[in-house]
Swiss-Prot record:
Cofactor(s) listed: Zn(2+)
Leading EC class: ligase
Name by which UniProt lists this protein: Cysteine--tRNA ligase
Record field: catalytic activity: tRNA(Cys) + L-cysteine + ATP = L-cysteinyl-tRNA(Cys) + AMP + diphosphate
Amino acid sequence: MRQSSENSQNLYLYNTATRTKELFSASNAPVKLYTCGPTVYDYAHIGNFRTYVFEDLLKRTLLFFGYSVKHIMNITDVDDKTLAGACRKNISLEEYTAPFIQAFFEDIAELNILPADVYPHATHYIPQMIKAIQKLLDENIAYIGQDSSVYFSIKKFPTYGKLSQLKLQDLQCCSRVTSDEYDKENLSDFVLWKAYDEQRDGHIYWESPFGKGRPGWHLECSIMAMELLGSSIDIHAGGVDNIFPHHENEIAQSESLSHKPFSRYWLHSEHLLVDGKKMSKSLGNFFTLRNLLDRGFSGEEIRYLLLQSHYRMQLNFTEEGLLACRQALKRLRDFISRLENPYPESTTISDEIDQQGKTFLKAFSDSIANDLNIAAALAALFDFIHQTNSFIDKSKFTQADANYILDLLKKINTVLGILQFSATQEIPDEVMQLVEKREVARREKNWAQADAFRDQVASLGYLIEDSKSGPKVKKL
């Protein structure tokens, strides 16, 4: 179900659960979207932001096609890493994570990522997690191990492995695993409640019927999603590294608790590489957003780089790529600046511009409707820019044409989030008078004087661009 929209059309998304591209349909309005948020033990790195920008594109596309969206993104403020950091500094978990939470919100604003409706903190849902664990214990789906931690018995969930396409009966399972993160070779019963260890956990723990401790990472997302979106959601998204074990374990827990399908669609973005290699602090190719901003790149340029490739393709992050994005954005800014100049007034849009605009909007919409094919959408945009620039150069371009194209660009920017538009540009009278004097000199073929007026305009911070429809003025 969706709200009425002139952009309504079929949207196809690749569902990791079925390994196929499927027609998207929401169960009810609004679309229930849950995305895995940051683990706030450190500053988020650009690999994280590749996933967050993909999720932003997904959300913006849903909105573009007329869907209302309820978006939940969790804040993991208790796990192995956050707890270790707080204990190392001998401060509370809240004190340790607060700066990184604040930095995360600053970073997503820098990247023009639309905010979620709710950012639940895992530590705010501990009572609900304890209640869920008790239910799983009561139903013999979970058990208390010899180490006093509570574990989920994956053999009690016959379809375990369906998301990551693991066949439980074909695998040698370890007895259990307490770490939040592990690989398929260590497939095992996973921890729901990690028993308190004073040497490891210091002063950080919660009381529960099964003893002191803290919840497992996988349970946190299940409970926050179900508490805020209900037992069944429409879309769950994250990075490919979340498929196993995190999302696999979420399904097992959630469906054991509700006896309903947890999520109808699962979407995952591919890895980000740096100079063709996996990002690693030891290789010196580990970047936070702040590292790149300090090196002179803008949030807009970084967003463009993270956005421009299809989300299911690995993205190779290079400085050369960022510089290329800078040039692409300059081309976009120059085009918008050209459109924002004054043109001869007209009440009608030219037939050619009208047709080009409709063709472009269809190509753009069809591209993003095809599993968020942003590369094809951007190609359509640059083709349209080329066509429009050619039309402006050779034809009588009017204010109605310019306004029509600017409206189109503003519409597609609700998806892209990379274009910047000026308020109505006010060219100072002094500049416009010099432009008029230059035109008089040009008509009189007094080229030296015309060049002098052009230089005076430049000294005031403006550039004159000559076209068949007359001179255009833009700020340098």
